[in-house]
Amino acid sequence: MARSAYSYMAMWYRKIGREVHERLMRKILIEWRKAPAIVRVERPFRLERARKLGYKAKQGVVVVRVRLMRGPFNRRRPDSGRRPKRMGVYGITAWKSWRQVAEERAARKHPNLEVLNSYWVADDGIYRYFEVILIDCNLPTIKNDPLYSGICGREVPRRRIIRRLRERQKKTIEYLKKTLLPRLKEAPSQQ
């Protein structure tokens, strides 16, 4: 059975070209570090992944690379005095995934575009990089495309990612309500 070029690209990215890939990535990541945090790019870095998620090389489809700081969910230490255990600094995890944060930042930077999808690109010692696929719903080439009708239809609300109207975000919020709210209600109030 014949395999597509995209399957070979994915295989090279995952397994075969690891040594070559590391040498290339070192140079690329040095350039990316010097660039701004949110940059529009001409074409996706991982073409096979972008095509799987709905990217097409046509007018109205934009790819943006987003750079995020790696590390835990850092919270500011309170100024007023209390014992260290009650500072609320350590052991806190963010409610959002890295990918969701990247999508939200890209959506804020480009308010006239809608987020289609996103994917991880690379990591280095300091940063984590994602590419976000955005589409312009006002263009007729996008409006008439059946692939994008679920995002650009009349009934679909605008700026879904900022308002947490995507399925992934709704599921996360529902899960947190199911798990955290009962615990908070059961906990004895300290008075």
Swiss-Prot record:
SUPFAM superfamilies (UniProt xref): Ribosomal proteins S24e, L23 and L15e
Keyword Ribonucleoprotein: yes
Pfam families assigned: Ribosomal_L15e
Sorted UniProt keywords: Ribonucleoprotein, Ribosomal protein
Keyword Endoplasmic reticulum: no
Any one GO cellular component localisation term in the record: cytosolic large ribosomal subunit
Disulfide-bond pairs as recorded: none
Molecular function, one GO term: structural constituent of ribosome
Gene3D superfamilies linked: Ribosomal protein l15e (3.40.1120.10)
GO BP: any one term: cytoplasmic translation
Stated family: Belongs to the eukaryotic ribosomal protein eL15 family.
Cited HAMAP family: Ribosomal_eL15
Protein name as catalogued: Large ribosomal subunit protein eL15
